[in-house]
Amino acid sequence: LSKPTIAAVNGVAFAGGWMISQACDLCVASDTAKFAITEVKVGRGSPWAAPLIHMIPQRIFMEIVLTGKPISAQRAYEIGLVNRIAEPAALMDTALELAREVLEGAPLSVAAARETVMLSTEMGRAAAIDAGYEAHVTAYTSEDAQEGPLAFSQKRKPEWKGR
């Protein structure tokens, strides 16, 4: 996927549900949501959980996969798995507000920022910096790169064109 994705978790996200929420770029959860990687409880493996090492601390990751015990939305927020918590009735509004905040950014810059984050989890620091620079060249040389500072100086919202 080239566009940012947002998971909205209301209820339980166990096993495959966790996998889907983890695969998204951002995650909003209701305050009643629960998360668990339960594979050890049923004799299965969870190789899909490997990218968590780039999302949460190693010992917390280890506890989650070794015990299979659920964690609350609050705990998921504390360890960095969840970006925002909302009341169940406000979950979708909260997720949509986050989406609107992302959409306020220049499209090419948002895409480059997302690509930089993804690349930095796949390579070493020096290579990630080089790749990040390459990812941002298009954004820096775009019409939007001219529009952003101009709109700022004119105290107005930018009119992004995505080019």
Positions of PLM-derived features:
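CoA-thioester-processing core
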Residues: 8, 14-66, 78-79, 94, ...
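Short alpha-helical scaffolding segments that buttress acidic/His motifs in well-ordered protein cores
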Residues: 64-65, 113-116, 132, 152
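Conserved catalytic cysteine-centered active-site region
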Residues: 1-7
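Terminal peptide-recognition signature
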Residues: 4, 21, 76, 113, ...
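C-terminal long alpha-helix characteristic of the crotonase
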Residues: 28-33, 82-130, 137, 143, ...
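Acidic, divalent-metal-coordinating active-site segment for phosphoryl/phosphodiester hydrolysis
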Residues: 68-75
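Short aromatic/basic micro-patch
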Residues: 55, 70, 85
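Interdomain hinge/lid region at the active-site interface
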Residues: 141-145, 151
